[in-house]
Swiss-Prot record:
The keyword Ubl conjugation does not apply. Gene3D superfamilies: ABC transporter ATPase like domain, P-loop containing nucleotide triphosphate hydrolases. It comes from Proteus mirabilis. This is UvrABC system protein A. The UvrABC repair system catalyzes the recognition and processing of DNA lesions. UvrA is an ATPase and a DNA-binding protein. A damage recognition complex composed of 2 UvrA and 2 UvrB subunits scans DNA for abnormalities. When the presence of a lesion has been verified by UvrB, the UvrA molecules dissociate.
Length: 118
């Protein structure tokens, strides 16, 4: 399976969108403020991946974890179970981005500092 297919996503700002995302690649979601970038990344894709991961655990292990709400979507295919590196509450800084809030920006800087060529 080389793609993630989403059909009928209606979480928060998303209005019944359909999309195909390539797997095993670094994907950037861009758009205007309020266009549903975080709704797609966190509330749809991550929530469904994390929900599938928790469902794969034993009943004993699940009692210690909170299950995320199932996203309002018709169909998601090709999505792997997901866990987050670190989860923080959002800041109220208007200059914050998904990259700075999730600290993925820091991880990417470390990665490219090691493997990048000047």
């Amino acid at each position: 399976m080389d793609k993630i297919e989403v059909r009928g996503a209606r979480t928060h700002n998303l209005k019944n969108i359909n999309l195909v995302i390539p797997r095993d690649k670094l994907i950037v979601i861009t758009g205007l403020s309020g266009s549903g970038k975080s709704s797609l990344a966190f509330d749809t894709l991550y929530a469904e991946g994390q929900r599938r991961y928790v469902e794969s655990l034993s009943a004993y292990a699940r009692q210690f974890l909170s299950l995320m709400e199932k996203p309002d979507v018709d169909h998601i295919e090709g999505l792997s179970p997901a866990i987050s590196i670190e989860q923080k509450s959002t800041s109220h800084n208007p200059r914050s981005t998904v990259g700075t809030i999730t600290e993925i920006h820091d991880y990417l800087r470390l990665l490219f500092a090691r493997v990048g060529e000047p």
